[in-house]
């Protein structure tokens, strides 16, 4: 149990720090879309696809690694709450079309990247 707590905690701390770094480096580049939030979600989508498929193919890997990568690292990196706050800000600003576009872009890209992550493992496993 303690190893699981450490795995999630350390992974979450590292993922959150990486998300913070992406926000600092990318959010100021384009005022219409916070690119740091977008990058965090898209990267997390891809890595979680790779991780889910990889761990499914290697069940002998200790469950703490799954907790570290998926629950901790990618949980800390991906940011549904920040994404939600940014969309609500667009709605409050009366930018309904922009808010809808942001939803489609974030969710669509994250799903596509997760599928690509799973496909990557499938292709590399042949």
Swiss-Prot record:
Subcellular localization(s) per the UniProt record: Cell inner membrane
Topology of the protein relative to the lipid bilayer: Multi-pass membrane protein
Residues the record lists as binding Na(+): 75, 78
Top-rank lineage group of the source organism: Bacteria
BP terms from Gene Ontology: cellular detoxification of fluoride
A single GO molecular function term of this UniProt record: fluoride channel activity
Residue pairs linked by disulfide bridges in the UniProt entry: none
Pfam families for this protein: CRCB (PF02537)
Any one Gene Ontology cellular component term annotated for this protein: plasma membrane
Regions crossing the membrane: 4-24, 35-55, 68-88, 103-123
Catalysed conversion reaction: fluoride(in) = fluoride(out)
Keywords: Cell inner membrane, Cell membrane, Ion channel, Ion transport, Membrane, Metal-binding, Sodium, Transmembrane, Transmembrane helix, Transport
Activity modulation: Na(+) is not transported, but it plays an essential structural role and its presence is essential for fluoride channel function.
Coiled coil: none
Family per similarity comment: Belongs to the fluoride channel Fluc/FEX (TC 1.A.43) family.
Function noted in UniProt: Fluoride-specific ion channel. Important for reducing fluoride concentration in the cell, thus reducing its toxicity.
Listed name of the protein: Fluoride-specific ion channel FluC
Gene: fluC
């Amino acid at each position: 149990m303690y190893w699981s707590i450490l795995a999630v905690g350390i992974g979450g701390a590292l993922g959150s720090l990486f998300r913070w770094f992406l926000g600092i480096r990318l959010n100021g580049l384009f005022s219409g879309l916070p690119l740091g939030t977008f990058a965090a979600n898209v990267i997390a989508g891809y890595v979680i696809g790779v991780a889910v498929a990889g761990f499914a193919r290697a069940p002998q890997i200790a469950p703490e690694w799954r907790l570290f990568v998926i629950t901790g690292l990618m949980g800390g990196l991906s940011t549904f709450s920040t994404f939600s706050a940014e969309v609500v800000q667009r709605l409050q600003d009366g930018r309904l079309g922009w808010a809808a576009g942001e939803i489609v872009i974030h969710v669509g890209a994250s799903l596509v990247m997760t599928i690509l992550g799973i496909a990557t493992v499938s292709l590399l496993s042949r």
